[in-house]
A protein has these predicted regions:
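N-terminal Rossmann-like FAD-binding beta1-loop-alpha1 element of flavoenzymes
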Residues: 18-45
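Glycine-rich FAD pyrophosphate-binding loop
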Residues: 37-62
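Dinucleotide-binding Rossmann-like beta1-alpha1 core, especially the glycine-rich loop
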Residues: 63-144
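Internal hydrophobic alpha-helix adjacent to the cofactor/substrate pocket in enzyme cavities
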Residues: 449-464
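Short FAD-binding loop at a beta-strand-to-alpha-helix junction that anchors the flavin cofactor
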Residues: 357-358, 423-441, 447, 451
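Mid-domain catalytic core of redox enzymes
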Residues: 39, 238-371, 375-392, 403, ...
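Extreme N-terminal leader/targeting segments of oxidoreductases
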Residues: 1-20, 38-39
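Active-site/ligand-binding neighborhood in enzyme catalytic cores
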Residues: 131-242, 246-249, 258, 276
């Protein structure tokens, strides 16, 4: 057992209870903390931001109505998150019929069902058929490991044809991955099309998406409440600056309140907040984890292999409906954003004070869009928003917010399986769990739940 291998104050207690610090109060960190408490460990969670939930965070629109900063939903195959809701928030997860569209040639085309594909006239019929056959063949495969070295772009161009590739896939790949689009493995696309969107039971032949009452933050608040009820501690507005050796334990240097307002890692450490622990679970992104601990050079280089795309999201509060579609992919390369998600076309608008539209983009970390103010971002997008929906007027915008997440999308590359890091790091009793480790699956709250469960299981199973 882990405790038997740990020396120093507070370790090796009679019942195997050890002091574990979890860095990050997003879904993965909270689930890991809860599971570790169930194993009988002493657990505290340290979060840089002044609230729990991480990338599942929300904000108050007024009168206690919360809305996600970044759009989320669940598929019926997302059993980890569904089961968690059934346990902690029974009856709060609801299912709604979805609609997907593709913007091309000046209009939004339905793009939800096979029938929609057959009616998608921006492509000649032969290309529609070819695209449908290729996707069907791909989703019936179960050998994703063999796809790890195959470029998705190359396969799509060959199997779907140049017109379907240029008109459907290329804008999506470029919008998602930019300069890395040509090196994204086919395994990633296979997972996107097969695992996350597997339809079960009542959703066969249509698409139902799940959304919890009160936003996705609600499940994080429920997790936090359960952690505290079990005796765990959650410290928000506490940024961990460094993990240092302290004989056979680990000492965490922690910044004081307000450090989140400064760039990560730059706040001064507060000596009163320094603490020694037996084990550490890091749920921060890989680029942030790279500078946290005294890693061996070879491991630090493996951490440095990972890059992320930054999410830039403009959220608009509208007087009236923008379009009749929940999720609109953009199939035109000259449009300055990747997609549109009209939340109130999924969840009934009556639950909110207005209509809400997310304008989504994924960009490189140094892209100028990451530096634009909310007003400047709206000004950059507003003309194209009117082109896509001709009835839209800038006067329809009542309020606007913008959000940026630097570690929104890990970038998979050819041969990505070899880049996946185990939960146990080379440093004894330090563990890593983040979205770079869920490949071939794409990032999502469901896989964050699974990650938290898996890393908690790994704690204590590896030699010190």
């Amino acid at each position: 057992m882990l405790a038997a291998r740990i020396a120093g104050p507070g370790a090796g207690r009679d019942n195997g209870r050890v002091h574990v610090a979890v860095i990050g109060a997003g879904v993965t960190g909270l689930v890991a903390a809860r599971e570790l408490l169930r194993k009988g460990h002493e657990v505290e969670v340290l979060e840089r931001w002044p609230d729990v939930a991480g990338q599942a965070s929300a904000f108050d629109l007024g009168n206690g109505v919360h809305l996600d900063r970044y759009y989320h939903h669940l598929f019926e195959s997302d059993r980890h998150m569904i089961d968690l809701h059934e346990e902690l928030l029974p009856g709060q997860l609801e299912w709604f019929r979805s609609s997907v569209g593709m913007y091309a040639r000046g209009r939004i085309w339905p793009f939800t069902t096979p029938r929609d594909l057959l009616s998608y006239s921006p492509l000649p019929l032969v290309d529609r058929l070819r695209l449908g056959i290729a996707v069907t063949r791909l989703t019936r495969r179960n050998d994703w490991e063999r796809m790890d070295d195959i470029p998705a772009a190359e396969w799509l161009r060959r199997e779907c044809g140049a017109r379907a590739y240029d008109g459907v896939w290329l804008p999506l790949l470029l919008g998602k991955f930019g300069d890395d689009a040509q090196n994204v493995p086919l395994a990633w696309l296979w997972s996107k099309l097969t695992l996350r969107r597997k339809l079960e039971g009542r959703s066969a032949g249509r698409e139902l998406l799940g959304y919890p009452r009160g936003s996705f933050r609600a499940i994080c608040v429920a997790l936090a409440d359960d952690i505290r009820a079990q005796g765990g501690r959650i410290q928000v507005d506490r940024e961990v600056l460094a993990i240092e050796r302290d004989q056979d334990r680990w000492r965490l240097r922690v910044a004081g309140p307000g450090a989140y307002r400064a760039p990560a890692g730059t706040g001064p450490a507060d000596p009163d907040l320094t603490r020694a622990v037996d084990a550490v679970v890091i749920t921060a992104p890989t680029d942030a984890a790279r500078d946290l601990a005294p890693w061996p050079d070879a491991f630090r280089m493996r951490l440095a292999e990972w890059t992320y795309r930054t999410a830039v999201v403009l959220l608009l509060e509208l007087r009236r409906q923008y379009s009749g579609t929940y999720w609109v992919n953009v199939g035109e390369s000259d449009v300055p954003f990747l997609g549109l998600v009209e939340h109130t076309n999924l969840v009934p608008a009556e639950r909110y004070p207005a209509r809400y539209l997310y304008v989504s983009n994924y960009v490189a970390a140094d892209d100028p869009l990451t530096q634009l103010s909310t007003d400047a971002l709206l000004a950059h997008y507003v003309r194209q928003l009117g082109v896509i929906a001709p009835d839209f007027r800038e006067a329809d915008v009542m309020r606007a917010w913008s959000f940026r997440e630097a570690a929104a999308q890990p970038v998979p590359k050819l041969g990505n399986r070899a880049r996946i890091l185990p939960f146990a790091t080379p440093l004894p009793r330090i563990y890593l769990a983040n979205t770079t480790q869920i490949y071939p699956e794409d990032r999502g709250t469901n896989y964050s739940v699974r990650l938290g469960q898996q890393v908690a299981q790994a704690v204590g199973q590896t030699p010190a």
